[in-house]
């Protein structure tokens, strides 16, 4: 058993860290291009869908009273082969997800720092290695860092949103084409990936203090926090650069909005938020997927090396 159990703040940070992990940076322009002035509504709809999924996941986890998420649900239902395949697909997906987060971290930080062409790749590798080392130090260490990172990045994004909303003009939210209801729905579908991450909590169930109570109430807080910051950013960023620029700038739209707000300090702050977002997502994904791998290995569906723990009580592989 791990030496440190996760309280409300740590569980909230893992979920929010997994969700606000770069999605808002890459999807905002796509959502505005589809939904126009109704982009915030798309984020709300996406959040409601995520909450429905998260509520079901939490309720099933509490009812089963065991970790593992969809893997354990399928296994307990007798679909062992499907559960095994699902576990392998999930774990492979989390490895690729961490690689994407690390690539984004390297791209953002390398762009600001300049330097040789290999620097972004080196920074990406360093981010992965640093988070692996942190997770090997135990749940308490990883959770404490996750809380600090998530609070910092949300504060930066909230500050950017406040600056933009102080200049609010509804006319600036419009795009050339009228999006209509279909555009709002397409926008909501495209932002659902920005809410991906809440499912990590099902793998951490055994690590939680008073796990039934905590798992039963964490989803609205975590998903609601992500949805709130997404909606505020969706309303604020067009006030600073205009919808056309947000659409054309793609994943650097928020960085450009930060520069429009505060010049170079704003650019650096938003770049820091992007870097922290990817790092927190790497940390949350490594922390939770290692526990999924341990659960699968305990059932004999992965090599026993994945079930081993180090002296800190953390999965060591």
Regions from the PLM with identified roles:
Residues 6-25, 127, 164, 176-240, ...:
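Hydrophobic, membrane-embedded alpha-helices of multi-pass small-molecule transporters
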């Amino acid at each position: 058993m791990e030496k440190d159990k996760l309280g409300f703040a740590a569980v909230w940070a893992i979920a929010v860290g997994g969700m606000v992990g770069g999605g808002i940076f890459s999807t905002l322009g796509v959502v505005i291009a589809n939904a126009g002035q109704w982009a915030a509504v798309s984020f709300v709809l996406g959040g409601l869908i995520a909450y429905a999924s998260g509520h079901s996941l939490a309720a099933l986890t509490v009812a089963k009273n065991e970790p593992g998420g969809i893997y354990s649900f399928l296994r307990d239902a007798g679909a062992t082969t499907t559960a095994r395949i699902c576990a392998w697909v999930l774990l492979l997906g989390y490895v690729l997800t961490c690689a994407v987060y690390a690539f984004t971290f390297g791209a953002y930080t390398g762009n600001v720092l300049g330097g040789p062409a290999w620097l972004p790749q080196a920074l990406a590798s360093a981010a992965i290695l640093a988070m692996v080392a942190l997770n090997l130090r135990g749940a308490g260490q990883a959770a404490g860092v996750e809380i600090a990172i998530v609070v910092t990045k949300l504060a930066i994004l909230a500050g950017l949103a406040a600056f933009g909303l102080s200049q609010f003009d509804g006319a600036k939210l419009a795009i050339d084409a009228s999006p209509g209801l279909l555009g709002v729905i397409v926008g909501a579908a495209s932002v659902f990936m920005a809410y991906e991450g809440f499912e990590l909590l099902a793998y951490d169930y055994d690590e939680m203090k008073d796990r039934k109570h905590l798992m039963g109430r964490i989803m609205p807080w975590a998903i609601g926090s992500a949805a709130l910051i997404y909606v505020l950013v969706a309303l604020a960023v067009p006030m600073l650069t205009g919808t056309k620029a947000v659409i054309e700038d793609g994943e650097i739209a928020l960085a450009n909005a930060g520069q429009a707000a505060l010049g170079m300090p704003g650019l650096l702050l938003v770049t820091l938020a992007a870097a922290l977002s990817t790092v927190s997502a790497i940390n949350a994904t490594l922390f939770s997927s290692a526990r999924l791998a341990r659960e699968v290995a305990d059932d004999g569906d992965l090599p026993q090396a994945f079930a081993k723990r180090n002296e800190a009580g953390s999965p060591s592989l």
